Design a protein with these regions (language model features):
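Transmembrane-cytosolic junction motif
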Residues: 6-15, 39, 73-103
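Alpha-helical repeat scaffolds
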Residues: 6-8, 105-114, 146-158, 182-195, ...
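Canonical alpha-helical transmembrane segments of integral membrane proteins
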Residues: 17-40, 72
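Hydrophobic alpha-helical transmembrane segments
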Residues: 51-73
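Generic helix N-cap/helix-start motif at coil->alpha-helix transitions
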Residues: 82-91, 125-135, 161-172, 194-204, ...
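Membrane-proximal helical linkers
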Residues: 82-127, 148
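Residue-level signature for tetratricopeptide repeat
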Residues: 94-98, 139, 173-180, 208-211, ...
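Long, non-transmembrane cytosolic or organellar matrix-exposed soluble domains/tails
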Residues: 210-291
Length: 291
C-alpha cells in the first residue's frame, strides 16, 4: 500500500498539465455547443433570400460567451483533477470505512504525510498532501490519539489554516476530544458551532444527547440511523451499548457490544467492548436466567 501512496504523488506531479489539456478540450467543446445554436463564431458571408451579406459571428455579437466558455473550461479542468484525487483516496479510505482497520489506516496515512513532506510536493501534489494531512488527523482520532491529533493541527499542519477543510477537521477533532473527556458543555458549544456540518451524522447528535443524560432519546435516534459504512455501524452500535448501559438495560447493551467485538477489527471500541463483555459476563448471564 505504501507503493500506491508513492504512485499517487507521482501521478499528480504533472497534474497542472493534465488540467490545462482538459481545460482546452472543455473550452472548445463549449464553443462547439454555442456554434450549434448561434452558428459560426467568426465573420462570414451568409445569404438572406437572394442577397449575400456579411454576418459578424457570435464572437462579435455575444463576446461574453467566449469568456464564459473559458471560465467553464477552467472549472472543468481543475475540478476533474481534484475529483480524481478524491476518488484515488477512496481506496485507502476503505481500510477504515469498510475494514475498520484503524491501525493500518493510521500507519498508511502517517506514511503519506511523511513521504509528502520528504518530496516537497509541487503542482497538484500539494492537494494530495493536504488530503493526506486531513486523513492523518482523522486516523489519529479513530485511534483515540486526540492530543496528538490536536498537536498536529496546531503545530505541524502545512498549508493555510483558513480553509474549510482545515476548520472542519479541527472542529471534528475538538468535538470528538470533548466527548472523550465527557465535557458536555464544551461539546454542546462545538456542536452548535458546526451544526450544519454534523447534521448529516446522527452519531454526533446521539453523543450530544448522551452527554445531556437523554439516553432514551439517544437510543431512539441511533436506532433510526441507516448504515452507510461498516465503521459508522460499529460506532453506532457502541454508542447504543453505552446508552443501554446507562439505562440499566444490560442485555441490550451486551448485544451491541457483541457486534462491536465481532466487527470492530482494530478499532479502540472493539477492545473496550471485549473488556466490557468480560467484566459484565456474570451480570448478563444472571439477567438471562431470570428471564
Amino acid at each position: 500500500m505504501k507503493e500506491q501512496i508513492e504512485k499517487l504523488y507521482e501521478k499528480y506531479r504533472r497534474g497542472r498539465l493534465k488540467a490545462v489539456i482538459i481545460c482546452v478540450i472543455a473550452y472548445f467543446a463549449m464553443m462547439g455547443v454555442v456554434n450549434m445554436f448561434l452558428g459560426s463564431p467568426f465573420p462570414h458571408k451568409t445569404q438572406i433570400l437572394f442577397m449575400e451579406t456579411m454576418a459578424n459571428g457570435w464572437i462579435n455579437t455575444h463576446g461574453y460567451l467566449l469568456i464564459l466558455c473559458g471560465i467553464i473550461g477552467i472549472i472543468v479542468g481543475m475540478g476533474s483533477i481534484l475529483y480524481q484525487i478524491i476518488h484515488d483516496f477512496e481506496k485507502f479510505d476503505k481500510i477504515l470505512l469498510e475494514e475498520c482497520d484503524t491501525k493500518k489506516y493510521l500507519e498508511l496515512m502517517e506514511y503519506a504525510v511523511s513521504y509528502g513532506t520528504e518530496i516537497k510536493p509541487k503542482d497538484f501534489q500539494k492537494s494530495v498532501f493536504t488530503l493526506a494531512q486531513q486523513r492523518y488527523v482523522l486516523a489519529l482520532m479513530a485511534e483515540h490519539c486526540f492530543p496528538k491529533a490536536m498537536a498536529y493541527l496546531q503545530n505541524h499542519w502545512q498549508g493555510k489554516k483558513t480553509t474549510n477543510l482545515y476548520r472542519n477537521t479541527a472542529l471534528s477533532a475538538q468535538l470528538v476530544s470533548s466527548f472523550e473527556n465527557r465535557n458536555g458543555e464544551e461539546f454542546a458549544g462545538l456542536y452548535q458551532k458546526g451544526e450544519k456540518l454534523f447534521r448529516k451524522n446522527g452519531i454526533f447528535l446521539g453523543k450530544k444527547l448522551f452527554l445531556e443524560g437523554k439516553y432514551a432519546d439517544a437510543v431512539e435516534l441511533l436506532q433510526n440511523i441507516q448504515k452507510k459504512t461498516n465503521y459508522q455501524e460499529v460506532q453506532r452500535q457502541y454508542m447504543l451499548a453505552m446508552c443501554y448501559e446507562a439505562l440499566k438495560e444490560t442485555e441490550q447493551a451486551s448485544i451491541c457490544m457483541e457486534y462491536v467485538a465481532k466487527y470492530g477489527n482494530t478499532t479502540p471500541c472493539r477492545y473496550a467492548a471485549e473488556q466490557w463483555k468480560r467484566e459484565n459476563a456474570s451480570v448478563v448471564l444472571s439477567e438471562t436466567m431470570i428471564e
